Amino acid sequence: MKKMIYTAAVLMCAVVMAACGGQSNVTFVKGNKSQMDSLSYAFGVNIGSGIIYDMPELKLDWTLMNDAMEKQLLEEIVAEDPQQEEARTKLEAFFSGPRIERMNAKAAELMAADSTRQLVREDFVDFDVFQGDEAQRKEISEAYGTYMGVNIRSSRLPLQTYWLKKGIEEYAASEATIDEGLAQAIIQDYYITKLPLQNAAESEAWLAEVEKQKGVKKTESGLLYRIDREGDAAVKPTAEDTVKVDYEGKLKDGFVFDSSYERGESIEFPLNGVIKGWTEGLQLVGKGGQITLWIPSELGYGVTGSGPIGPNAALEFKVELHDVIRAGAEPVTTE
């Protein structure tokens, strides 16, 4: 299996999710030094091996990188982080400028004696792209850690920073207690086996408690809902209609993963083009109304999940139905 965290992609691309600003970070902790966390250590080994394999010339200061990463992992989750943008700017300038120039110069040196030589990564293992510029090494190491930390933080993985850092540091020093293959196996087991089972059990227990709440009803499919505002009962959508809504989506721990309110813009979509829980649930409320939906995973994103929504995760949505556009007709208006 290809690396679970492909570090070049972690560096240059943001995690695809719609996390909303100012939310507490409850998944990353410093951890217990006396009790090893194998998942965190495996992620560290995976990250360290990815950096070294993909960019052997990038001789980072691992301590500075790790400290910058840890600082970000322990901060709250925000939609737009200015520190991330500052780090991105520094990294893009370095990778598109000095790094390319120095790599090209090294390649020219290696090929001077044989222009037909095919260069491979091993040719750059002993090459230091910073060329002794310690100020630049410090700046890029910290920027790399900052940018990577913000992205990993958005994943909300249950990691301990002490063991994550230790995995990176020990792999970089050729002292890791597990190899890349075992690290990937541990990560794969978490995503494919442990996390789906954990989410399924926790979601089932959560929905059972929600069902006991006042005003909550349950459909035959297992969808839980509460009508917060009835709206116009004469103008309810069908599955074939298009609706205009505002909404807020939460995970079972209250984490807001998506919100049209946060973006400041309502959204329109055909009701038969979304998850089953939405298709069924919005037909229960009238135009101008508001409904809260608790959606079991089989009516949501199922065993695959989506972005911040894990496999077998139940969801909560608060939805305001602003308008109903009948299939093949103009928007319905009411006085």
Residue ranges and their predicted role:
Residues 1-9:
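Bacterial N-terminal signal peptides that target proteins for export
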